[in-house]
A protein has these predicted regions:
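Short, intrinsically disordered, mixed-charge
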Residues: 73-77
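Conserved short beta-strand edge segments in small beta-sheet-based binding/regulatory domains
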Residues: 79-93
């Protein structure tokens, strides 16, 4: 299993609807072609996208750091004018603290 990341995208203020629609159109084409929002053929696996009123969250798994670099650059180049994107590495807190919780009984 690779490193899991939570990707957050938030719509920028004062973005025109036409710009946002154009970015989404490109995003849908990218996803249809590669199975992820970052346009990489392998090395980044998309698990789920969640929408919110301010943008959304994407759960991805990274197996190849170079592919992740391309994934990030694609976002900055293609969507950066309409959304602010951040990536946070995740760890399994349930597994990490399982013994501590068990010993707290």
């Amino acid at each position: 299993m690779g490193q899991m990341y939570l990707q957050r995208f938030a719509y920028r203020d004062r973005v025109h609807k036409a710009e946002l629609d154009q970015a989404w159109a490109e995003a849908f084409k990218t996803f249809a072609k590669t199975g992820n929002w970052g346009g990489v053929e392998k090395g980044v696996t998309h698990h789920q996208t969640y929408g919110t009123g301010w943008g959304g969250l994407v759960l991805i798994e990274v197996e190849d750091p170079d592919a992740f670099g391309h994934y990030q650059a694609y976002h900055n180049k293609t969507y950066g004018h309409v959304v602010q994107v951040t990536w946070e590495p995740l760890f399994d807190m349930d597994r990490e603290f399982e013994e501590t919780i068990r010993n707290s009984r």
